């Protein structure tokens, strides 16, 4: 039986990413985020209104979503815990400025989304940033010979927890194609209708 529980927040599993942006003081900068969703060519991210990233993205209207794997956990944590300072050089992160947005594309992150801000809605201390995805970039070993993404090869880290404790969750290489459970159920139903 389910029961109600009190918590100030609940993160039920969101991929962690390193938000890259131009910075008026430091040239380029990064911070860690986990609040996002994507539909088609749209991406929505959430950042605290008081954060340097919010100010810089409001100014430049562009950013990158650099999605690390677990090999970059130290840098990912550092980028989130240290604020209002230059972090790219401090952590030794190699990057290239995007040709489309000039926001930093981190070499160590296997998947990157290059984004242009469409609008920002600020409410309750959070900037909800709606952006168009201008480009999707992936390491070549994550793409098959037809340029399709190899889902079983990419394992982003997920952020989960509540007001009491927050943790990182890791993916394994199991994948099931969308619709495969319905197909299995139909086959099972077909077999049972033949035998009855």
Region annotations inferred by a language model:
Residues 1-196:
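Basic, polyanion-binding surface patches
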